[in-house]
Amino acid sequence: MDFIEISLIFREHLPLLELCSVIINLLLFLVFLFAVSARQILVCVRRGRDRLSKDDTVSASNLSLEREVNHVSVGFGFNLSLLCCLYVLGVQVLVLVYDGVKVRREVSDWFVLCFPASQSLAWFVLSFLVLHLKYKSSEKLPFLVRIWWFLAFSICLCTMYVDGRRLAIEGWSRCSSHVVANLAVTPALGFLCFLAWRGVSGIQVTRSSSDLQEPLLVEEEAACLKVTPYSTAGLVSLITLSWLDPLLSAGSKRPLELKDIPLLAPRDRAKSSYKVLKSNWKRCKSENPSKPPSLARAIMKSFWKEAACNAVFAGLNTLVSYVGPYLISYFVDYLGGKEIFPHEGYVLAGIFFTSKLIETVTTRQWYMGVDILGMHVRSALTAMVYRKGLKLSSIAKQNHTSGEIVNYMAVDVQRIGDYSWYLHDIWMLPMQIVLALAILYKSVGIAAVATLVATIISILVTIPLAKVQEDYQDKLMTAKDERMRKTSECLRNMRVLKLQAWEDRYRVRLEEMREEEYGWLRKALYSQAFVTFIFWSSPIFVAAVTFATSIFLGTQLTAGGVLSALATFRILQEPLRNFPDLVSMMAQTKVSLDRISGFLQEEELQEDATVVIPRGLSNIAIEIKDGVFCWDPFSSRPTLSGIQMKVEKGMRVAVCGTVGSGKSSFISCILGEIPKISGEVRICGTTGYVSQSAWIQSGNIEENILFGSPMEKTKYKNVIQACSLKKDIELFSHGDQTIIGERGINLSGGQKQRVQLARALYQDADIYLLDDPFSALDAHTGSDLFRDYILSALAEKTVVFVTHQVEFLPAADLILVLKEGRIIQSGKYDDLLQAGTDFKALVSAHHEAIEAMDIPSPSSEDSDENPIRDSLVLHNPKSDVFENDIETLAKEVQEGGSASDLKAIKEKKKKAKRSRKKQLVQEEERVKGKVSMKVYLSYMGAAYKGALIPLIILAQAAFQFLQIASNWWMAWANPQTEGDESKVDPTLLLIVYTALAFGSSVFIFVRAALVATFGLAAAQKLFLNMLRSVFRAPMSFFDSTPAGRILNRVSIDQSVVDLDIPFRLGGFASTTIQLCGIVAVMTNVTWQVFLLVVPVAVACFWMQKYYMASSRELVRIVSIQKSPIIHLFGESIAGAATIRGFGQEKRFIKRNLYLLDCFVRPFFCSIAAIEWLCLRMELLSTLVFAFCMVLLVSFPHGTIDPSMAGLAVTYGLNLNGRLSRWILSFCKLENKIISIERIYQYSQIVGEAPAIIEDFRPPSSWPATGTIELVDVKVRYAENLPTVLHGVSCVFPGGKKIGIVGRTGSGKSTLIQALFRLIEPTAGKITIDNIDISQIGLHDLRSRLGIIPQDPTLFEGTIRANLDPLEEHSDDKIWEALDKSQLGDVVRGKDLKLDSPVLENGDNWSVGQRQLVSLGRALLKQAKILVLDEATASVDTATDNLIQKIIRTEFEDCTVCTIAHRIPTVIDSDLVLVLSDGRVAEFDTPARLLEDKSSMFLKLVTEYSSRSTGIPEL
């Protein structure tokens, strides 16, 4: 080639560059005008909408009074950027004037003025935009400006390059005004390009605020008062996702918190989605009651508009994705010298660029849309499942345990939401096949029919796989449900497991359940590996069939046609790959839909079980006519039968009877909780319910008492007084703001009951239903509470109370005596005594117990003093619950306060925040910043010490090499144009291609199998490590950690590790190697591309780092915000009866919706951030592709091989997708790795002492005598909490019966926990038979001790398994224990005897029966030391007396420590320990203590005796 030809080339290219510049400037200018117009239209529309709806913004009551004072400082960078814009504008205006004069003088073509005119117009607009930034106080450069500056500099460099080559060839005589202008503006454009890369305008805005800006009455500390900018974003902002810039900017400077994340737009909130789905679900149920309703249909009806909008983007994206494959043959022909029209190459390059640009934008909008659609579906379904959980009938609860329902929310709902990604594949697959066939028909002719046949065969092959995967998924989910159910049960009852030394046994059971789950997981993952093989093999099979058919038919294959076909196959690969995934996902989604649909169709509580009449319309408060009720409607024996009762307004009704007589069921029938077989129940007014097993919410004491009602200080103070809580609250370190642990773990049994009573009293109901609330209280507190609460505070209310305290019965207006589910006696106290029979037997047993106590009269001089009460009055002014709180103070300020008052609010809020740090339950720990490399290494080393990682990379590299080799072979071997001969024999061509391509698919199968093997081993190891760590955790961990947090890790996080992370890791390796292959192919043809790839890669890494700073924190917040949803659900299910009893369902549903929004807020920003990054990645890669195309077109014909250039274009079509997918796969991998990080946290819990210490194992006969010695024992629950036991010292002689008494909260149960080492003493020591228990293993200690705990616990299973979980005893021994514990006849009356079922939490057994089962366990264990912690509180006096006799007989030679509020239970003990405020007040024989007139024990006995003589003396 000579200089003349080169000169002609550059003469052609320079005008084209100028033409490109003109077109780009005009396009950007039009976009600018369109954006401005669209923004104005959107503003007008929103103004009109705002007038019609108040819902689109946060209400004024929720907004702060903030008036920000913005201080704007203009930096040197801004001034220089404005100066550069004006400078370039001036230069272009000069060029325009010069060229205009020249044209006029020389009478030239006016077309030459287009370039300087467009440049002048563009830089005028740019100067205006930059100047406008100052008035907008914008710290960030608009995306449009940044793109404009970047393109201007790029075109300038290209023009300078062409100008330089031309001047070198033709000489300086050809120098023009444009050349001079380019040289003049290059430094300015370079600086502007640098600013475009940084994105900073040079303007700094300092926002300051006065005290008047402090938000008032913000309920949640984590609340944000700003609605997401997404709701008001303009068209350009929506397309470019620049509305997210402020959040990402904040995240790049500091770790994001929930308060940084804006509120959702009203249309995106859970409430909106829930209402729509709920309405359509009801409609589907009512349309055809005879057929099961379709949940899928209800979902489609609810969200079809969003799906249709997504379909538009999906369809457009599909169309433009086939533009490249269609044009490749033309491009190869052009490079081969076949030019159809002038400048065809540039036109083709422009079309390629435009199509990829449209594909990029539509892809991001499409993916963003499906994410939002899935988000709405998940929110709505979660809310539906929660609501259903509150309404479940007793029968339905047996079919769905809380663990299973957690799985519905955590796994099934997630899967249904994820199906939005596959929703459009159903109709897109045929569309893509049709487009592919059209292109193939152009390329290979009639052989395209073979493509269709091969495609159909490939699809049919996947159908059996889908069925197999559906079965595997169904079995996997069933196994996961079972594991979650047992895990949830173990976490709830961990205290019992540790006390009984059963934790290893139950942990092994969980490991066995995991093994079963692991088996199905292994099958699912290996089947997925086979699906991956099918995915990569299908296009190879289709291509081989197509090419073989073409060769057989004699169709001429050309390089262009082959490359077009290969590009088409590569695109067709996606729907072919997605089809197995689609079928698999449809199968999985169907399973999840069926599970949730079945749950939503479960029977709810009978709405007509109780007829509620508004207050004031009747004098009859409660009326039951011919009531027959049964927990199991299919049972032949009803729970309650023949119930007749009429209670007038204001009456006090007492319900009594022996254990299992139906007392609690009687309360349930009034509430409508128990299924009604026949009869009628009517109540007049509202109800307040206090359950027998206290239900306490996590939160502070005030929140538990208010229970959603507004604070009224006087009323609140009276309630505290009436419930005897004032002294307790004063003793708490934070008063009524003390955080209560899960299930009230840091409260004593009596305190929990009094909080329950306070909650009921504060609601001011008309009817109060109290299920034995006094059993957990000592005599004095019980007497005071009965007097102040029932006789005084509820004097004008209707009260129905269940009680075993016979002494309270005389105060009742009506007494009901139940036996075997029937009311056998009813009437007043005296009338029933005279009638004799069962009621007289109950009362007589009580009086006999009282008469057995020989009680001297206390001296009159001490009668008005109470040393125990005085010792408890340790007033803490900081915990005064009656001072004005933050809300009251804020209200006063709103009514006319000053700034100083607001400062007081701020200070008080700061103090409250500081005080929370000392609470028992803390906010969930969250790692901040970059995921530690230690986490990655721990995961990669978890399976075979990382030995599989190199093999996975090697297999992927081999696959990629063979893929490129097969495509290169087809491009090289086929002729460039029709008529030319092929370089090889057609048969050899096909054999080599098939061998290379099939070999690549084999390697991908090897990679997929290795990834599955690696993932399985790593997941199993991580799970077992976490499980063992959790089970070895001290009890303080469970006290301070809500079960929802742990369940979140063993369900959601573990599912991510099981099913997601292995493929994420493999996908990242795959994408990395594929990207390297694409770049290698492109640079092999046009090495100049590498010069642009390097800066683009740097820019990508910078953006990835910028994005990850916010993304990882958003993912962590998402994970943390999921726990409260699960926790609330578990808590609500446990207290559903209480919630319904107070009619609080709507409030709890609203709370659930709020928590869902708190979860969705960071999730929404997280998915938007992903699309934000992908958009910018793909735009950069599209520019690289465009640059490659321009270079290929610029080369003279014959310079490069058209076949290789076509191959480079074929791979370049995938560059934008692969580059963004590479960065995205790493980002998603890091986001998913956070699940491993969270599991790793729980694998590193500091465990309690070893279970067995081989060097200090006690003798097998230990303890021989059972002597317990406490030496200066001090105990506290946590380092940040006060001491509970203050130097307790005493000796319990072996074989003696020790009674432990004291006021509620005096430290009795804490002492027992120290004995079992659930809490390790901070000082002192405890010895048993002269062996320091701190020196031996926990299992050796706890397995040698027996206990009947205060809260009786039954595990789901059978009676046999609950009595003998370790399977150490024969049936005869078990029956003997049941008979001695008074349960033998009850169990014999069951159809399955010892195999009689026990439901979750033992719900089908009464509380009293559960305590008797605990007694049976102790009888079987026959430990030398037995502890009874309020073991008989929930049984009647006669049964209690009988149990005490059994214990005295069966444990005659054992040391028995009894904690009891019933004085007769401990009066015959050998020694009595009186505790007061965590100290030993008295310790002696009962006789000596009763002889001492100043004895605290004497006062306790006297109080009990006085109370037991009857209510009139109270």
Swiss-Prot record:
Enzyme Commission numbers on file: 7.6.2.2
Domain spans labelled ABC transmembrane type-1: 307-588, 949-1231
GO CC annotations, alphabetized: plant-type vacuole; vacuolar membrane; vacuole
Reaction(s) the record says it catalyses: ATP + H2O + xenobioticSide 1 = ADP + phosphate + xenobioticSide 2
Cell compartment(s), UniProt: Membrane
Mutant lacking the gene: phenotype: Increased water use efficiency. Low phytic acid levels in seed tissue.
Keywords per UniProt: ATP-binding, Coiled coil, Membrane, Nucleotide-binding, Repeat, Translocase, Transmembrane, Transmembrane helix, Transport
Stored Pfam families: ABC_membrane, ABC_tran
Single Gene Ontology BP annotation: abscisic acid-activated signaling pathway involved in stomatal movement
Matches recorded under PANTHER family: ABC TRANSPORTER C FAMILY MEMBER 5 (PTHR24223:SF189), ATP-BINDING CASSETTE SUB-FAMILY C (PTHR24223)
Family: Belongs to the ABC transporter superfamily. ABCC family. Conjugate transporter (TC 3.A.1.208) subfamily.
Name recorded for this polypeptide: ABC transporter C family member 5
Organism of derivation: Arabidopsis thaliana (Mouse-ear cress)
